[in-house]
Design a protein with these regions (language model features):
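Alpha-helix-loop-beta-strand connector modules within alpha/beta enzyme cores
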Residues: 53-79, 83-87, 109-117, 138-142, ...
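Hydrophobic faces of well-ordered beta-strands that scaffold small-molecule active sites
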Residues: 16-22, 42-44, 70-73, 93-95, ...
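Catalytic cores of alpha/beta
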Residues: 30-35, 77-91, 95, 100-105, ...
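Conserved N-terminal beta1-alpha1 strand-loop-helix module at the mouth
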Residues: 1-70, 74-77, 109, 146, ...
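Extended, intrinsically disordered, low-complexity segments
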Residues: 233-237, 241-265
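Conserved anion-binding
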Residues: 80, 92-166, 174, 179, ...
Length: 265
């Protein structure tokens, strides 16, 4: 039987997929985000967030039970990290700094069971996908989503080759992209690189995705042609909401809250 992957259904229907970014290991926050109307996916951030592999299972199940797809971002393309993320029941995987087609091929290999890959067998805790054991294995190679992050000039240079690989989503990390390129965030060179990635995805029939911190940013990216966009993070929403209420109450702001979560450049 097919795995229950709402985000894949959304993508196949050609509908824009808005999602949230989870950096805190809280099932309550995960449930709140995932149960919000029109949220298609929630990224469990195991790279920069305060989340580690011991949190993956509970977070994935809470998100899936709320009707959204849990995706797990691992810190690197290590085979064991990918295996642990997928064995938690994640509907898809995100790997940062996929800076070459060679790295992407290794990611795909680690994600898929033999004969198409090298993933070890042990789907005992994949409840969030709706299947376990052999039923899970029979559909996992086809149904699980593979997202690689494009956030380095080397990846931009190789983007046409990267999107030829057996991935589903090319996900732009715009902050790391600007830093690694040594250019202004939102400047001409930065936006040109983003447009190049978007065009390559469209030509290859792959999902074009990008990280955004605000709904306004996300709306512009959807209008630009992106298929999948984050609208904000949990920590940004918490920080900005509290800071706004505090400023309204006191008439004062401070440097820390004015800076938001610290993610922005």
């Amino acid at each position: 039987m097919p795995l229950n992957i709402p985000l894949r259904k959304k993508i196949l229907a050609g509908e824009p997929a808005a999602g949230g970014w989870l950096t805190l290991p809280s099932t309550a926050i995960a449930r709140t985000i995932a149960s919000t109307k029109n949220v298609s996916w929630v990224l469990i951030d195991g790279e920069h967030g305060l989340i580690n592999e011991s949190h993956f299972y509970d977070l994935a199940n809470v998100i899936a039970a709320s009707g959204a797809s849990p995706l797990v971002r691992v810190p690197a393309e290590e085979v064991w990290l990918i295996k642990r993320a997928l064995d938690s029941g994640a509907h898809g995987l995100m790997v940062p700094m996929a800076n070459s087609a060679e790295i992407v091929r290794k990611v795909v290999q680690a994600t898929k069971y033999p004969p198409h890959g090298i993933r070890g067998y042990g789907p005992m805790f994949t409840h969030a996908t709706g299947q376990l054991g052999g039923s899970y294995k029979d559909s996992a190679n086809e149904d699980l989503l593979i997202a690689v992050q494009i956030e380095h000039p080397n990846a931009v240079k190789e983007i046409e080759d990267i999107v030829k690989e057996d991935i589903d989503i090319a996900f732009i990390g715009p902050f790391d992209l600007a830093v690694s390129m040594g250019v202004e965030f939102g400047g001409v060179e930065h936006e040109a690189a983003i447009s190049k990635i978007l065009d390559a995805c469209k030509k290859a029939g792959k999902v074009a995705a990008i990280f955004c911190l605000t709904g306004e940013q996300a709306a512009k990216r959807f209008a630009q042609g992106f298929d999948m966009v984050s609208v904000t993070t949990d920590i940004d929403t918490l920080t900005d909401g509290f800071a706004a209420a505090l400023q309204a109450a006191t008439g004062q702001s401070n440097a820390f809250t004015a800076a938001g979560s610290g993610y922005s450049l």
